[in-house]
Structures are given as structure tokens and as C-alpha cells.
Amino acid sequence: CETDHIAAWKSSYSGVAKMGSKDKTFILSESGHIAGIINPPSKNKYGHYTNPETGLTADDWYASADKHEGSWWPRWDAWLSKKSGKMVAAREPGSDDYPVLAPAPGTYVKSK
């Protein structure tokens, strides 16, 4: 995210070069860590940048990137769908050896 205070985008971008796969895409979302990642597409709050060139400096990548309105989620969903298998039903939690302790989301999330 452009103004991310946890994972600076230029550092994240340089990390992509160290990934072995040639099938990789860097997408930069607008805003900060939470707002740029967590906001769902329905909020239509922030855009994102893409650039197929991967051998550039972070500044050059940004300068020549295309800006897109709306969430980066649909782009990620399309990428992930191409790499995923078919949808399967979720398993039923619990077993004789490991019974369910409480229904989701669990009691620990309500603890203070």
C-alpha cells in the first residue's frame, strides 16, 4: 500500500525480484496497511496500480504504472482462480478425538 507503515511498498516491491517464479505480479494499492488491504470492493474506496514491467526500480515502476479505480481484490481473485482447483465443500469441524469446543468464531474472541 502506498502509505503502509508496516510493509513499506518499495521494500515489498524489491522483494518480488527475489521470488523464483517468473509468474508474478506486483500490485500497489492506495492508502495504508489496513485501508488498502482490508476494504472490500463494495466500499469502492481505493484504487490500485499495476505495471507488467518487473525489472525497474520502484520509482520507475510507479512512474510508468497504470492506475485503476476500485479494489485490487477482483484482479487477485482472477489470478487465484486460474491457479486453484475446483471448489469443494468445507469439512465438518470436530471428530471423536478432537471435538468442537465451541461454535465459530470460538469463545476466545470474546475474552477480555
Predicted segments — roles?
Residues 1-112:
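C-terminal subdomain of alpha/beta-hydrolase-fold enzymes, centered on the catalytic histidine
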